[in-house]
Amino acid sequence: MNIVITCAGKSNRFKKEGINIPKFLLPLGESTVISNILDTYDDNDNFHLVITNKQLDQNPNLKSYLNDLKKNIYLNIIKDHNLGPTYSAIQAKTCESKKDIIISYCDFLIDWDYKKFK
């Protein structure tokens, strides 16, 4: 399965409250939001994360952190934009398959039975 996760948002509301890291990097339990999202899927899935060059500039260790989360992480680095998560998902050029794709946001968690879904 190919999992496209759009992480390219600007987190404007969080920044207004003084939180200056991307939402997907916020701590959640003993980990981060993105780590918890990835854990809802199978380790053998392909994870296509879409992030911006601006996020990389502001978080120098971001690339290595994301690559260390799972073995099949594919980063799609795009320019900062205001076009929304659908635009970001379309930019996941590492996802060449036209089938078996799940598109997920990076800032919500769901409790579901992924094995039943597959």
Listing of model-derived features with the role each one plays in the protein:
Residues 8:
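The conserved beta1-alpha1 loop
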Residues 19-24:
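Short alpha-helical oligomerization interface
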Residues 2-5, 13-15, 27, 31-103, ...:
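Conserved N-terminal catalytic core of the sugar/cofactor nucleotidyltransferase
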Residues 113-118:
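Conserved donor-nucleotide/metal-binding helix-loop-beta segment in metal-dependent transferases, i.e.
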